A protein has these predicted regions:
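Small-aliphatic-rich amphipathic alpha-helix that forms the alpha element of a beta-alpha
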Residues: 32-34, 106, 112, 118-166
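C-terminal helix-cap and adjacent tail motif
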Residues: 6-9, 13, 177-216
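Glycine-rich, charged/polar anion/phosphate-binding loops
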Residues: 32-35, 89-94, 164-167, 187
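Short connector loops at helix/strand junctions that flank enzyme active sites
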Residues: 43-45, 99-104, 175
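Short loop-to-beta-strand entry elements in the cores of soluble alpha/beta enzymes
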Residues: 41-52
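A glycine-rich helix N-cap at a beta->alpha junction
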Residues: 69-79, 167-193
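N-terminal targeting/leader regions
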Residues: 1-21, 25-33, 37, 42
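Glycine/small-residue-rich phosphate/adenosyl-binding loop
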Residues: 50-133
């Protein structure tokens, strides 16, 4: 799939074929492409954990299930009465119920032990951490879409850091950023619908939106 088509049709794909594995040669090529993304001063302070072992996936799935049961009722209440929003939530429900069956998890992590690690105020450190990892994450999501794999960015499973760190045997200087469940996508996906660009672009200062369509 051409890259522009992948970008125009990208979405969080949660409905996956659980019985079809993702070959290592395919996954490694996608991970290699994802790491073409830039990092702060080219420190390349990232690392990936690939989880395929059923027992490991089940352990992570247990953590995810507990958090999902905790937070999903809140989201469901917020969507009450909105039929479209409730339909949009259905793939997430399926994913939560089948999380451990998904063929592979990719867990991008940040290594704080590299040189030039950010210092100073917490917001500076956090923005530097994520700014060095999320460009590669987006590359991976696009690469998956381009070859027909479904993928979604999940942060909920890593909210419970102590459990995830213990399951994955993570050293102190390696921080999980998110979990990306990956498998071959079920169904076909057309272009995504987004807010018109004129509604979200401000020129020179906030509130100046010359690209908006005139009302009426």
């Amino acid at each position: 799939m051409p890259m522009l088509d992948a970008m125009q049709t990208q979405r969080a794909v949660r409905l996956l074929i659980t019985s079809k594995p993702v070959a290592h040669e395919v996954l490694l090529r996608l991970l290699e492409l994802s790491l073409k993304a830039p990092t702060r001063t080219n420190t390349q302070d990232w690392t990936y954990l690939v989880v395929e072992d059923p027992e490991q996936k089940a352990r992570i799935g247990t953590v995810y299930g507990r958090l999902y049961k905790l937070f999903n009722p809140i989201v469901t209440r917020q969507a009450k009465g909105d039929a479209q929003e409730l339909r949009n939530m259905a793939p997430g429900q399926w994913q939560a119920e089948h999380f451990a069956e998904i063929p592979v998890f990719v867990i991008p992590c940040y290594r704080t032990s590299v040189n030039h690690r950010p210092t100073g105020r917490p917001q500076i450190r956090v923005s530097s951490f994520y700014g060095s990892v999320y460009p590669a994450v987006q590359n991976l999501l696009l690469a998956c879409r381009a070859v027909g794999l479904g993928a979604s960015l999940q942060t909920l499973p890593v909210w419970w850091q102590p459990s995830i760190r213990k399951i994955l045997d993570l050293p102190r200087d390696v921080r999980p950023v998110c979990i990306i469940p990956i498998g071959w996508a079920k169904g076909r996906y057309g272009p995504t619908q987004r807010t018109p660009i004129g509604e979200v672009v401000h020129l020179d200062h906030y509130g100046n939106q010359p690209f908006r369509d005139p009302v009426g």
